[in-house]
Regions:
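Helix-coil boundary/capping segments in enzymes
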Residues: 1-118
Length: 118
């Protein structure tokens, strides 16, 4: 009998372009990114914060190593907090594109390992 693939559909992902947009343009919405040396990005979400994010949230090569270690075959990459609902027109569109483009790129590079979940 063939082994069924193990698929993780709860695989949050923060593409570099998404984080840069958040850092550069999120301030007027109370959003931002602070880069802590040797720890990774910390997201400012209004009064709260999230992070520092583990490197595998942003680095797909590290994520693949982690997936192999825990024997997960496929990650359905998805966005999580702060989402994009808070962002106005142009910024919201740019954030969506950054996320969707990064998920598509990940799938093209590793079609058997990553799918996008928008």
């Amino acid at each position: 009998m063939d082994k069924s693939p193990i698929i993780d559909i709860h695989a949050h992902f923060y593409p570099e372009r998404f984080l840069k947009l958040l850092e550069e343009e999120g301030g007027s919405f109370g959003m931002g990114v602070r880069w802590e040396s040797n720890k990774g990005p910390v997201l400012q979400i209004g009064e709260g914060r999230l992070g520092p994010l583990k490197p595998s949230f942003t680095d797909l090569d590290l994520r693949l190593k982690e997936m192999n270690r825990i024997k997960v075959d496929v990650h359905a990459l998805s966005l999580t907090r702060p989402m994009v609902y808070w962002a106005g027109g142009d910024l919201g569109l740019a954030l969506c594109r950054a996320m969707n483009d990064a998920m598509a790129e990940a799938h093209r590079a590793f079609p058997d390992r990553f799918v996008g979940f928008a």
